[in-house]
Amino acid sequence: MLVNEGIRAREVRLVGANGDQIGVKSKHEALEMAQRVNLDLVCVAPNAKPPVCRIMDYGKYRYEQQKKEKEARKNQKVITIKEVRLSPTIEANDFNTKLRNARKFLEKGDKVKASIRFRGRAITHSQIGRDVLERLAKECEDIATIEARPKMEGRSMFLVMAPKTEK
């Protein structure tokens, strides 16, 4: 952001402190007008012909901009993907533990990637793994939507669920 002497243009379109159009003035005149009211001359549109400059308190303006950026960062939600690993021959209690973890992640607002790794000859029975993932998805369907249906990648099968958004 160009301020006061940092402005290189000879002529500028000047906007007053309260937002009124003053007109096209020389840079020197605009600087004098800003200094008379103890404010800064700030170039708000440097690419315009002639550049648009405004008389304002630059310190206050920068503070407001930083406050807006901080507020915007605070309101951003970072979505992370949590992984729950299962096996095709998972027992009931182990499945319930994994289900509880998946539901906890979804309720927190994170996406869940459920994966099954097939070891050895278990890959020949990939339907068993698909059934386990489908069962997990069915148990979570009240709080989650399925983003990616179960699919094989190498020796693993994946399912991605995202939390349902409230409207």
Curated annotation (Swiss-Prot):
Sorted UniProt keywords? Cytoplasm, Initiation factor, Protein biosynthesis
State the NCBIfam families in the record. Answer: infC
Q: What does the annotation say about its assembly with partners?
A: Monomer.
Q: What is this protein called?
A: Translation initiation factor IF-3
A Gene Ontology annotation in the biological process aspect, one of them, is: ribosome disassembly
User: Which Gene3D superfamilies does this one have?
Assistant: Translation initiation factor 3 (IF-3), C-terminal domain, Translation initiation factor 3 (IF-3), N-terminal domain
Q: Which SUPFAM superfamilies match?
A: Translation initiation factor IF3, C-terminal domain (SSF55200), Translation initiation factor IF3, N-terminal domain (SSF54364)
Function according to Swiss-Prot or TrEMBL: IF-3 binds to the 30S ribosomal subunit and shifts the equilibrium between 70S ribosomes and their 50S and 30S subunits in favor of the free subunits, thus enhancing the availability of 30S subunits on which protein synthesis initiation begins.
Domain of life, source organism: Bacteria
- A GO term for molecular function: ribosome binding
Q: Which family does it belong to?
A: Belongs to the IF-3 family.
What PROSITE patterns does this protein's entry cite?
A: IF3
In terms of InterPro entries, this protein maps to: T_IF-3_C_sf, T_IF-3_N_sf, Translation_initiation_fac3_CS, Translation_initiation_fac_3, Translation_initiation_fac_3_C, Translation_initiation_fac_3_N
Its Gene Ontology cellular component terms are:
cytosol; membrane
Q: What Pfam families does UniProt report for this protein, alphabetically?
A: IF3_C, IF3_N
Q: Where in the cell is it found?
A: Cytoplasm
Protein biosynthesis in keyword set: yes
